[in-house]
Amino acid sequence: MARSRKNSLVRDIASHPTIPESQTIVGLLDDSYLFDKLKKLSLAVENSDSLQRTDVSEGCSEVNGSEATTSADVKKTNKYLYYTTYLDQLNIKIDEYKVVLDQTRQVNDQLDSSIKKFRKISQDTGAFIEETKTIYEKQSKLSNLTESIPKALHYFEVLDPIMRRLNHATSPAIVKKSSFTTMLATIDESLRFLDENSDLKDAAAYRIKFKQCLIRACELISHFLTNLLKQTNQEILDKTKNKNSLTGLPSTTRDAFLYSKFYTIADTFKIQVSEIVKRSNEKAYNKYHDELNSILYECFNHYFQTRLRLLTPVIWSHIDEIVVKDKDQGLVKFIQDGKVYFQQLCADEYKLFVEFFPEKECRFKINQWFLQLCEPLYDSIRVRVLKETDICTLCDSVTLFAPYYEFEEGSEEYVKQFTDIQYDKLFEPIVQKVQARLILRVQIYVQQNILSYRPTRDVFMISNRRRKSKTSLQGGNEDATTSDDNPDPLLESYLSSFKNRSILPISPNDADDKSIDSEESTDKISQLQTYYPPLLKTLALLSKIYEMINSVVFDDLAHHVVHDCIVSLRNAYDMVIKSSAGKSDFNNLDISLAYLKNLLMLRDSIQNFNIQYTVNETYLDFSGVEGFFKSLKENGRNVLKKTKSSSILTLARELVPKVVNNMVDARTELISELRNVIKDFTESTSLELIDDTLDINSDEDLLSKNVKLRENIKARLPRIYEQILNYIDDQEIVTNLLDAVQELITQSYSKYYETITELAENGKFAKDQVADVMYLDVFTDFFAKEVADLLRNGDIDTITK
């Protein structure tokens, strides 16, 4: 048992070598029970010793005599021997453990010392590594710098040879050598290096010098190209003796001089100019774009000037031929011939240009030059346009260029349409000039044919009826086209367009349908001719100029034209109404219906033009000045006396012109005018139907007047309905007019019935008389039935016809 404990204790110490001594001792004496037993054993041993000493003095015989007693004491002493032995062993073990503990502490201290040494070695090693790394990086940097210095110095060293070569260049032909191209590449590399390494000493100064070398090299290229163009131009002039002789050459010979000769130098030119174009469009050269673009534009200008000097005599010669050929032709033919020639000319020039310059980067420049090339065309057409007075001709001229303005600029279709030559920009000056002339002629046309129109007394009479006899239609067709001896081409074109709409390719079996279409078109034209002449001219004008000018400009014009037409219609209507007052041969209902018919025609027609904008019109009102001078003329000194009595500031305020902002909205004005004429018509119709039947007079019989009212409605309403049908062919409008008349008469009858009922209650009328009068709801049903019968019979007649 003792060995096993020893082995376990040694094993425990070996596994926990750093446990302190105090903790080990406490562990051995941790058994409180054993400690108590040891205390008791100690007391017992002391008591036993004292008893033995007392017994020795009394006598040894007693001890010797009684072996049994001694044997018992020995046994008692041997009883604690195990514990004492154990205690001794514990003390020995404690001493041994103390030795082991001291050794362990010594080993631990040695380990701590070793760890500290290792840590110091690790720190020293890390510092060594960092220092070594820094030294290595410096060494690598210095090595790279050592290797890059010769390369960097190369960019600086090449400057002097390049400058000497450029400054001592005796001829621009040096640009044709391959070494010149290599030199340009070296300049590019040097500039790129200096831009990337701007922190180098004197980098800015060297960059400026290299930039000067680049500009100088590009200038040499430009001079070479200029000389090449001059030389080619001079060769052509020498062969033709003088520049005007090109116009007398055959077309094939002329093309050989103008184009074939230039094609021979195109490759050389393009190779050199591409060097400038490439650098002008390179992002790395943003700092030098101004100088490079200036040199490139100089190349453009020399090329264009050379071409223009050769082409101008030929162009003017051809324009003179067109002028002579189209002398008796109209403006449209002249523009068309010029347009065809210049289209071909621009196509040929574009084809030649892309052989001299890179197409993608330089396309914009040739399109700009085309405007200068076409100036002879602009000038010649401008002269012809200023002489043109016919609106139809001006519109047809604009139509020639319509295919170029179908798509919005910048759209995908637009880009596909103008991949090379932008014909929309090329012909835009012509279109603008023609449109400006067209707008001027439109304003003059409105002034002469609409505002200045003087209507006749019967302008709203029978000639405006919807139905006319076939004889009158056939006989009056030619005369109805115009109201005077001067035919109006615009109106004739407008009326003939209705006839042309029915002319379509047909088979022999469709002859009957063709006859029907012809009759319908003739009837349509005849019906149109019954309208107010300024109205027809307004519609003819708007339909002709629609989509011929800018939409905003058209809306502005359309508002003013429609406004002027409404003013002309209203003036004619007022004039006829005044002239018909008190005359039996005029019927106000016919006049109102004719006026309404024209307004409806105007309303329906302008919807097709999609007028969208309201026009704000600003002008100065000088009515105060005019009124002052008028008063001065009429009253003389009295005005001056009033002026003295009043404030001078008041007079000055009255004389200052006023700024008037007027909003022109033709659609709103037209709707307002329609409401007014419908109101006038319903009131006139109601008065004719009612007559004096709703006049209240105590001396008259109410029943007889009520019967007369019913008779008036039955007798006159069908006639009024016929009058409406003579002018209005829209059944919905006819129904609305009758409904408006019915509503107004019903309101009048309602007031009348309430009045006579009150009078009967007050005793002014006999109640039996009021009882004989139709009730309001009975009268309403009666009138509604009459209207319904008229409309039903009218629908049957329409279907039968």
UniProtKB/Swiss-Prot annotation:
Ranges annotated as biased composition (Polar residues): 471-480
UniProt keyword terms in alphabetical order: Golgi apparatus, Membrane, Phosphoprotein, Protein transport, Transport
Keyword Membrane in record: yes
Keyword Membrane: yes
Spans annotated as Disordered: 470-489
GO CC annotations, alphabetized: cis-Golgi network; Golgi membrane; Golgi transport complex
Modified residues (Phosphoserine): 507, 647
Topological relation to the membrane, as annotated: Peripheral membrane protein
Predominant localisation class: Golgi
Localization per Swiss-Prot or TrEMBL: Golgi apparatus membrane
GO biological process: autophagy; cytoplasm to vacuole targeting by the Cvt pathway; endoplasmic reticulum to Golgi vesicle-mediated transport; Golgi organization; intra-Golgi vesicle-mediated transport; macroautophagy; pexophagy; retrograde transport, vesicle recycling within Golgi
GO MF, one annotated term: cargo adaptor activity
InterPro entries, alphabetized: COG3_C (IPR048685), COG3_N (IPR048320), COG_su3 (IPR007265)
The protein's assembly and partners: Component of the conserved oligomeric Golgi (COG or Sec34/Sec35) complex which consists of eight different proteins COG1-COG8.
Additional detail: Present with 4140 molecules/cell in log phase SD medium.
Function: Acts as a component of the peripheral membrane COG complex that is involved in intra-Golgi protein trafficking. COG is located at the cis- Golgi, and regulates tethering of retrograde intra-Golgi vesicles and possibly a number of other membrane trafficking events. COG3 is also involved in actin cytoskeleton organization.
Family statement: Belongs to the COG3 family.
Protein name, UniProt field: Conserved oligomeric Golgi complex subunit 3
Organism listed in the record: Saccharomyces cerevisiae (strain ATCC 204508 / S288c) (Baker's yeast)
Organism ancestry: Eukaryota, Fungi, Dikarya, Ascomycota, Saccharomycotina
Gene that encodes the chain: COG3
